[in-house]
């Protein structure tokens, strides 16, 4: 005999939905690579805003032809756009591949090709890295530059798209799909092993269980009253799961940005 209480899969999309409904006004502060019209690099918004923009990026990816299990990469710092991608990519069943920009160029080529990434979201800082290797990464169909139109660089990257333009044209209405909670949610490659970097896949279930453990009093004790600055890079073991824990509890998140 099986119990059926709360018989629903543990999915990452559930975290951002919970954040939007239970902690809508919790603040997310982020330092950007670019500045706004006033010369400010600090960006502020709420969990509700992040949830809407996550749905926008999800809808944009679906329109671009993203499928479940497709690998979609990021080459980015800890910032609010990267946070949106944590949910927008994995939420539709695609796999978020967070790339460590501190790897050697030949290692970047190896892991992008090995993962067979279809698109790469890239912060302004790392555009030159990709320009130098773009002819060697055959699976990549295009690059989404994480900036607004006013700060788009003059780049040789083929099929370069502005992040803000992409989501401006997308709807924030989306019913997140349900699928097996053991499906891959994110992909990280090792950076300190012998030979080529090794890929490690995290499931939706493992990610949520890790976040649940992390917020406990016996671990980090994260609550809605907490203010957290994730120093661990979002390309390193998913910043130790802190972005997910922030969404789970409604803690204030402060992303340090480039550097």
Indicate residue ranges for each PLM-predicted region.
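A short helix-loop-beta submotif of the ANL/AMP-binding
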Residues: 71, 77-97, 101-105, 113-119, ...
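Conserved AMP-binding/adenylation subdomain of ANL enzymes
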Residues: 208-227, 235-259
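Structural core segment of the AMP-binding/adenylate-forming
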Residues: 15-17, 63-64, 91-165, 179
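Conserved AMP-binding A3 loop
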Residues: 44-48, 185-212
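Conserved AMP-binding/adenylate-forming core of the ANL superfamily
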Residues: 28-79, 83-87, 104-109, 162-165
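A short N-terminal helical cap/helix-turn-helix that marks the beginning
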Residues: 7-33, 52
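Conserved structural elements of the adenylate-forming
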Residues: 50-57, 168-169, 200-223, 235
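Conserved pre-ATP/AMP-binding loop-to-beta segment of ANL
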Residues: 6, 24-27, 144, 168-189, ...
């Amino acid at each position: 005999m099986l119990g059926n209480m709360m018989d629903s899969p543990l999915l990452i999309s559930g975290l951002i939905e919970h954040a939007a409904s239970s902690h809508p006004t919790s603040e997310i502060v982020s330092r950007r690579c670019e500045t706004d019209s006033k010369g400010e690099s600090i960006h502020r918004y709420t969990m509700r805003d992040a949830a809407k923009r996550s749905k926008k990026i999800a809808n944009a990816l679906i329109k671009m032809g993203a499928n479940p299990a497709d690998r979609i990469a990021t080459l980015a710092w800890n910032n609010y756009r990267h946070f949106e991608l944590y949910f927008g990519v994995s939420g539709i069943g695609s796999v978020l591949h967070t790339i460590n920009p501190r790897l050697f160029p030949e290692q970047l080529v190896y892991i992008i090709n090995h993962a067979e990434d279809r698109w790469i979201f890239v912060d302004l800082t790392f555009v030159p890295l990709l320009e130098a290797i773009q002819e060697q990464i055959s699976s990549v169909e295009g690059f989404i530059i994480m900036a607004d139109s006013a700060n788009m660089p003059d780049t040789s990257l083929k099929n370069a798209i502005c992040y803000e333009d992409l989501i401006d044209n997308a709807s924030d209405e989306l019913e997140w799909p349900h699928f097996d909670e053991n499906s891959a949610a994110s992909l990280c490659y090792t950076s300190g092993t012998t030979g080529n970097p090794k890929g490690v896949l995290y499931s939706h279930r493992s990610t949520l269980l890790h976040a649940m453990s992390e917020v406990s009093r016996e671990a980090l004790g994260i609550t809605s009253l907490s203010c957290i600055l994730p120093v661990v890079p979002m390309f390193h073991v998913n910043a130790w799961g802190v972005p997910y824990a922030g969404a789970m509890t409604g803690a204030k998140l402060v992303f340090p940005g480039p550097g």
